[in-house]
């Protein structure tokens, strides 16, 4: 997988990695390599982040969980290039080969959340929105949300509008 693609995948899923040590397997991201490509999944009990990308070369179907701290380091090492990252798995370790750098991390063992069941397959509802406006609205409403409290952002989708609200100990936000 290209370095910039892996970097983007990590950046778009790492926020949902749990910091709760009572479920150690969720303190990392699940990597799934199958006929669809590479899928990364992270969960923390409140959020689920998923990113899927096609991959050129794959040697079978397999999955493993990489600790969030290791992925943070991989993200820092990856550059904005199309050079390919080699990902190799062993019985207890994962090896990332990024250019001339090799990072070896232990695998997290345990039963990862059944994430496929958490996402509806045939949802008839489709939403089309202006990405810039949507992200700006999320940024405004999220100003009072702290990473520590992880207050949910509630979206109510109506005809021609999306109503976003959140309630935290600091106050309420609505847009």
Where are these regions (language model features)?
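DNA polymerase processivity clamps
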Residues: 1-52, 56-108, 122-175
């Amino acid at each position: 997988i290209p370095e910039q693609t892996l970097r983007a995948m990590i950046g778009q899923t790492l926020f949902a990695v749990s910091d709760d040590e009572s479920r150690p397997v969720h303190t990392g991201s699940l990597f799934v390599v199958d006929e669809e490509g590479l899928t990364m999944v992270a969960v923390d009990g409140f959020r689920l982040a998923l990113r899927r990308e096609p991959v050129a070369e794959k040697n079978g179907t397999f999955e493993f969980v990489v600790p969030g701290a290791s992925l943070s380091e991989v993200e820092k090492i990856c550059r904005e290039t199309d050079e390919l990252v080699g990902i190799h798995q062993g019985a207890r370790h994962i090896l990332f080969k990024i250019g001339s750098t090799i990072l070896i991390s232990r695998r997290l063992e345990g039963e990862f959340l059944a994430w496929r069941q958490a996402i509806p397959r045939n949802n008839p509802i489709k939403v089309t929105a202006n990405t810039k406006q949507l992200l700006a609205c999320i940024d405004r409403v999220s100003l009072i949300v702290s990473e520590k409290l992880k207050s949910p952002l509630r979206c109510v989708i109506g005809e021609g509008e999306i109503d976003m609200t959140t309630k935290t100990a600091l106050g309420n936000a609505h847009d």
